[in-house]
Amino acid sequence: MDRREEEEEETGYGEKGTRNQSKEDESRLGKIFELIPLDMIPDILLRLPAKSAVRFRIVSKLWLSITTRPYFIRSFAFPSSTRLCLMACVKARDMRLFISLHQHDDGSYAHVDRCEIKSPKHDYYNPSSESVNGLVCFGDFYNIVVWNPSMRQHVTLPEPKPHSTVRYFIRSCLGYDPVEDKYKVLSISGYHNGNHDPLVFTLGPQESWRVIQNSPLDIPLPTGGSRVGTCINGHVYYEAQIRFKVDDIFNFENILMSFDVRYEKFNTIKKPADPTLRNFMLNYQGKLAWFCSDYSSIRFWVLDDGDKQEWSLKNFILPFPISPEIDPIFECRVMLTGVTHDTGEFIFINATMCDAFCVLYYDPKSGSERRIEYEGIGDREFCINTGILECKRFTIDWFPNHNESLMSLVNVLKKAD
């Protein structure tokens, strides 16, 4: 197998158009790109979509070397805000369909990018965390799958092996250490006796699950279909439950946990004293936010200082109702799914699949809103093609501020030679 065939197998981009390209066309293409100054090549490649950047690896050994360097891959994962998208993941039958909806389209109607990937044998429905630099993680109980939709790749991690076999759930979160440029999966097993068993897996060759020593007694709440955690600035945040004893009686308290991905240390964070029942975490422009919403307003607390545990309150009255009320413009139910990193706009999507799928971006500071209708999502043809109409169970998960990644998952489970 030559280098190009290896590249096609690794990236999943070995499609007919590339494989059948004649040597004459490749030679002509190479001569054109030889005219480009060397110092401009990385900047040009960083502006391309992931699919194009991967295919341009056939131009020359130099271009292959540039696009596979760790520095280039890392830079590609932090694009300008205009390239961020709202990604939908449809799980139905034995496949996952990843749909990218660009967050900064100017028009009222926009096209979408699609990528369909066959699921591995054990592919569970629940997402474990938000998109982390283009990677997403799904898992439940004993199977954890990390996906890179841009490279059309996924890897199923080995089953975590805790100390005890008597456990009743496992929760996992994907995190990123920006200092050492490492991705880690945190997995915590819960037991009926209230103990815990935290493990961590670094994405890379010759790695395995490691026990995290000296961690506190905490148990992540079984959150069902909602995400367990979110990664912000090298820390994974997730909701947890701690147990303590008062007068020989065990009590429980719901708190937030912070996990330092680099140093693998835990820290407890006291949640704001807010009586609202509908609570959830979001990344609010690079800070952890604890959202407390009702059907006409959004109130959220922003963690300004994690060490001092200082929260600031923000409160906004919405000009439209939130699910379960029917919005008169959407003519269906809408729900909050995220906040744009750059502009701080709230992202509202259809809570149910409508014939015309729309996303509403609302700027709470200016009170302005923009509505984008995305073609080919939610209509009958879409439901037939994805198999939704035939499935008794399917899910659609949303990942705001998703970006493309060139990180390869092929060698994650590779053993030493």
UniProtKB/Swiss-Prot annotation:
Q: Which InterPro entries match?
A: F-box-assoc_dom_typ3 (IPR013187), F-box-assoc_interact_dom (IPR017451), F-box-like_dom_sf (IPR036047), F-box_dom (IPR001810)
The region annotated as signal peptide is: none
Q: Which organism is it from?
A: Arabidopsis thaliana
Q: What is the lineage of its organism?
A: Eukaryota, Viridiplantae, Streptophyta, Embryophyta, Tracheophyta
How is this protein named in the record? Putative F-box protein At4g21240
Q: Which domain of life is it from?
A: Eukaryota
User: Where is there biased composition of kind Acidic residues?
Assistant: 1-12
Q: Where is this region: Disordered?
A: 1-25
**Where in this chain does the record put each F-box domain?**
30-76
Q: Which Pfam families match?
A: F-box, FBA_3
Q: Where is the composition biased (Basic and acidic residues)?
A: 16-25
